[in-house]
Design a protein with these regions (language model features):
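The alpha/beta-hydrolase serine catalytic core
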Residues: 15-94, 98, 104-110, 115, ...
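Gly/Ala-rich beta-loop-alpha elbow adjacent to hydrolase catalytic centers
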Residues: 1-4, 8
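Aromatic pocket-lining residues of Rossmann-like dinucleotide-binding sites
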Residues: 11-12
């Protein structure tokens, strides 16, 4: 999920897994990450807190050195499901649609509620059902 989806999408063209499950893949963090890190460190802090996810600004500087996440993800040809909650404040619909558009066999599923972590029983259930269907259909 999130940064894990970003990493999975980036490594999939080389690893070539049987399928790819991307839950709210976090490519959006890549855009402007060094500039955001500069602003945070200028305020006297060396970390950020996003919905309880605390990370050092060195992480942002390391991310800035990587290529565009969508370029890294190109070249994987297996089945893909991209899942996002419709009220996710950290990963936008456009990033998820862009990931889905990179792949030949991809499905984009939007789950109602639950935020970035699918933090309600109905959203978690819908997410798990979408994943189970994807596994049954593709793997």
């Amino acid at each position: 999920q999130s940064m894990g989806g970003y990493v999975a999408a980036s490594i999939a063209p080389r690893l070539r897994p049987h399928g790819l499950i991307l839950m709210c893949p976090g490519a959006g963090m890549w855009y402007g990450c060094a500039r955001r890190a500069d602003m945070v460190t200028q305020s006297g802090k060396d970390y950020a807190d996003l919905e309880g996810l605390v990370y050092k600004m060195a992480f942002n500087y390391n991310m800035a050195a990587h290529p565009d996440p969508f370029e890294e993800a190109k070249g994987y040809n297996g089945p893909v499901i991209v899942i996002r909650a419709d009220d996710d404040k950290l990963v936008d619909d456009e990033s998820c649609k862009r990931y889905a558009g990179l792949y030949q066999v991809a499905e984009f599923v939007r789950v109602s509620g639950g935020g970035h972590n699918f933090a309600t029983i109905p959203s978690r259930t819908a997410c798990e059902q979408a994943i189970w269907k994807f596994i049954q259909d593709n793997l």
